[in-house]
Structures are given as structure tokens and as C-alpha cells.
Design a protein with these regions (language model features):
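Glycine-rich phosphate-binding active-site loops on the catalytic face of alpha/beta enzymes
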Residues: 48-53, 121-123, 128, 171-180, ...
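Alpha-helix-loop-beta-strand connector modules within alpha/beta enzyme cores
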Residues: 59-94, 138-147, 151, 188-206, ...
Length: 289
């Protein structure tokens, strides 16, 4: 489902917009309203975040929201409600979760429940393909997409293994450290996308490469959309919620970002762009949104 939605965006001469929001901030109902608002503003795919007590790869903005959800006892059943809401709103829902909550819930059980709720798959930022046997088997059985991450520090062997194991898209993390919005979009992301596409071609698949981390406005979205198949935005959406702008703020941000990915243009989507040349280089190895 995810690959088809990105295919559809590319047929329109643009990258896909992928929004991330966690369930449970400021409460479950308000977070689901905001998630749906992201779709109404133009998001093609929504990453629905699972609250976790030790989100080591998340920056302070996302951690602040997730901490509230964890203290309130928000869990995977609430996440599945959000999945249903996104599917009903016409976007493609994927869950983004650290691996521990999925193991505790039961890998096969979660795969079944996610599929039944209309979910397309899952992004697992702290799970590498080598250690994902149970999830690979469960996702094969249910037809769910499984999205693994690569970073500028990834070796060619790691890129190849990730390209071979992923389904839906490959998540290219453009900077190192924890997640959060950036003032500029560095050129490390473009280099990583090119390397990942080479790995995908070598293993004989046709996966898309989507870039996460750092984008906070439509202009930055246009920069990333010039060389990526999808633009992933997380912290900027969460900031709208933390600052009290709620669903209306999320909807407006989505509209700005959606306009940005459309500005990149079909010709730039076809090949790597040099539009970010000269901007400060990103650090190496960050994962998240």
C-alpha cells in the first residue's frame, strides 16, 4: 500500500508527504484529531507513533509529547484506533514503534491486529534486519510493509541488507543524533539517497527512498523532494501540538508542506538534484523523524 501511494504521488510529478505524530498528546482523542488533520492538509502517508518510555532516538520535542502519553498509559490499542482513523480519512497508515512494545504485545498478534485495522506496515527504528526474523515472518504472512532505516554512516553491506529486507520504502535518516527540526537541509541526505538507490538496484527491487529528519516548512520540503521519493516530517508537526495550535495548526502545516513537495517538480524527482549544494553538511547517523 505504501509503495503504491508513493507511486501515485510520483505519477503527479511530486514526492509523497509523510507525516509523523505520536498517539496520546495531549490525549488520545485530540491526537487522533490532529493525525486526521494532517491527512486533510495533504499528507499521503501517516507514521503513527507508539509512545515508549525510553525513546532514545527522539529529540526533545517528540519526547515531551511522548512522555505525556506514556504517563497517561497510552498503548497499542489506542494506536490501532488511530490507524483505523487514518485509513478512513483516505491516507496510508503505518505504525512507527521501538521494538520493545511490539515484543511485549506479541509480534504475530500485533501483525494480525494492525492488518485488521487497515494498517499498511511498520517502521522499526531500533530493529535491524539481521535481528528481525520474527517480524519478517509475521509481515510476510500478513502482507504488511516493513520499513528499515539507513543513515549516512551505513556501510554498503548494511545498505544492501536493508534494501533486501525492506518493503514499502527505505527510510533514509539524513542527520545524526536525535530527531528535531533543522535550520537548513544538508547535502548528506542527497548523498545517502543516491547510495541507497544504488543498493536497491543491486538487489533488484524497485523500492522508494524517503528522507526523514529536519524538515520544518514547505521550502525545506521542496529541497528534499527534489531528490527523494518521499519527505518525512515529524518534529514540526509535534511542535504545532505542543504550542497549542492543535489540529488547525497541524492542518495548516500539512498544507504548507504539501505545497512544498509539489514545487519540486517532476523533472527534479527523476534524478538527484544539486539544489542543496553549498548548505552545511549534516552530521552522520541520525534516525527518527
Amino acid at each position: 500500500m505504501v509503495q503504491q501511494r508513493i507511486d501515485s504521488a510520483r505519477s503527479e510529478g511530486r514526492a509523497a508527504l509523510i507525516a509523523y505524530l505520536p498517539v496520546g498528546y495531549p490525549d488520545v482523542d485530540a491526537s487522533i484529531e490532529a493525525i486526521v488533520a494532517a491527512v486533510e492538509g495533504g499528507a499521503d502517508v501517516v507514521e503513527i507513533g507508539v509512545p515508549y518510555s525510553d525513546p532514545g532516538m527522539d529529540g526533545p520535542v517528540i519526547q515531551q509529547a511522548v512522555d505525556v502519553a506514556v504517563r497517561a498509559g497510552v498503548g497499542l490499542r489506542d494506536v490501532l484506533r488511530a490507524v483505523e482513523a487514518v485509513a478512513a480519512a483516505g491516507a496510508v497508515p503505518v505504525v512507527m514503534s521501538y521494538w520493545n512494545p511490539i515484543e511485549r504485545y506479541g509480534v504475530d498478534r500485533f501483525a494480525d491486529d494492525l492488518s485488521a485495522a487497515g494498517g499498511a506496515g511498520m517502521i522499526t527504528p531500533d530493529l535491524i534486519p539481521d535481528e528481525a526474523g520474527a517480524w519478517l515472518a509475521a509481515s510476510d504472512r500478513t502482507g504488511l510493509d516493513r520499513v528499515f532505516l539507513v543513515a549516512p554512516s551505513s556501510t554498503d553491506a548494511r545498505l544492501a541488507a536493508t534494501a533486501a529486507a525492506s518493503r514499502g520504502f527505505v527510510y533514509a535518516a539524513s542527520t545524526m543524533g536525535v530527531t528535531g527540526t533543522r535550520a537548513t537541509v544538508g547535502d548528506a541526505a542527497e548523498r545517502l539517497v543516491a547510495r541507497t538507490r544504488e543498493a536497491i538496484a543491486d538487489v533488484g527491487t524497485d523500492l522508494h527512498v524517503c528522507v526523514g529528519l529536519g524538515v520544518s516548512n514547505g521550502d525545506q520540503a521542496a529541497e528534499v523532494a527534489a531528490f527523494a521519493d518521499g519527505v518525512i516530517v515529524g518534529s514540526a508537526y509535534v511542535r504545532e501540538m505542543l504550542d497549542g495550535r492543535g489540529a488547525d495548526g497541524v492542518r495548516a502545516l500539512s498544507a504548507d508542506l504539501a505545497a512544498g513537495v509539489r514545487r519540486a517538480g517532476a523533472s527534479e524527482l527523476a534524478s538527484s538534484s544539486s539544489r542543496t549544494a553549498g548548505l552545511p553538511s549534516a552530521s552522520v547517523g541520525e534516525v527518527g523523524a
